[in-house]
């Protein structure tokens, strides 16, 4: 079975309310949050106040491997100043995502991965089997997270369409350099 495994939430509506707030949030976009803070300061349904700043963005290709590095610091109004580096390494049949968060004081770090609604999860020892149509299409392992949970989410593939789905929540409590890594191998 072919198809997406991970998605962002999409946009369901522009009307004020909980759904509009959710689809604009960091939680809906496969990024890191620290102490629940957003990467950008969101105002109302359409406006953004202080914005996160990208410090580094690079792509390195060597043989069959590509490495994408992004480094962002959130907006200036966050409670604790932090910096997030994400390194995505693409192999022919695998992807690894390393999140490195530099945070000066003990903080709750959370990384989310939104699943496509057609993807189901089975826990197999320390791995997750990612399934589509009852067939395992990939295996995922996690390094460095204190907890891993599946949380309810919503996927909005088109305007006005809301489909229940799940997101994988990785959490770690810490200070200094906090790292969590996800390895995904196709089957």
What are these regions (language model features)?
Residues 11-187:
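CBM-like, beta-strand-rich accessory domains located in the C-terminal region of large
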């Amino acid at each position: 079975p072919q198809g997406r495994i991970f998605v962002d939430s999409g946009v369901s509506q522009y009307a004020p309310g909980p759904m509009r707030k959710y689809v604009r949030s960091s939680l809906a976009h496969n990024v890191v949050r620290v102490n629940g803070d957003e990467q950008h300061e969101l105002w109302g349904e359409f406006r953004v106040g202080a914005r996160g700043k990208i410090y580094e963005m690079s792509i390195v290709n060597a043989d069959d491997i590509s490495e994408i590095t992004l480094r962002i610091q959130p907006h200036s109004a966050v409670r604790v100043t932090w910096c997030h580096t994400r390194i995505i390494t693409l192999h022919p049949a695998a992807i690894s995502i390393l999140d490195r968060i530099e945070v000066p004081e003990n903080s709750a770090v959370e990384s989310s991965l939104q699943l496509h609604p057609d993807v189901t999860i089975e826990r197999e020892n320390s791995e997750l089997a990612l399934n589509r149509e009852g067939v395992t299409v990939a295996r995922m392992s996690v390094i460095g997270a204190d907890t891993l949970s599946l949380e309810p989410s919503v996927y909005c593939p088109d305007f006005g369409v809301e489909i229940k789905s799940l997101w994988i929540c990785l959490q770690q409590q810490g200070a200094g350099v906090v790292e969590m890594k996800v390895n995904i191998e196709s089957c």
